[in-house]
Amino acid sequence: TENGRVAYPVEFIDNAVLKGKAKRIPDVVIFLTADAFGVLPPISKLDKDAAMYHFMTGFTSKVAGTERGIKEPQPTFSSLFGEPFMPLDPMVYGEMLGEKIESGGTRVYLINTGWTGGSYDERFKLDVPTSCPDVPSELLDARSTWANPEEYDRVAESLAQMFVDNAEKRLTTMSPEVRAAGPRPLRVA
């Protein structure tokens, strides 16, 4: 299915740390998102503030076939990519992440497992590679893959505004630096 899940014992992973805590901070963290609107790039590198922003907003999409009644893609924001399971204010976890990124020199990437047909633009403030092994370069600038660039602009503006509205409504303790790392519509409505 489009929204399949699997679970298995941690002991099945050869290099798993069974004590529940690693000895060091990871070198790389990957956030997965599914942009059903097709405007986020397939891969982008996040600086500390952008990583905190995307962690605290937890954007993904609901698509037809994954939930009853969903006919069109719908944005969904679940702070920390698992909001119901996090009892503290998202900023607490966001700051913890920021501290770990700084102290460990961790690189953070946002991987879009959703649709292509749209890509990076100034609204989303994401660093997108110009080349990636085994990935056609035209996919990295997916705005050019849309048949209608004006439609891309319309959809991108709408999604950027959804990010802003979500942060203003639900993430009131987000620092100005982290908020500034998030998307912004280019046009004033």
Question: What residue ranges belong to the model's regions?
Answer:
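Conserved NTP phosphate-binding and transfer environment spanning the P-loop NTPase/kinase superfamily
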Residues: E2-A189
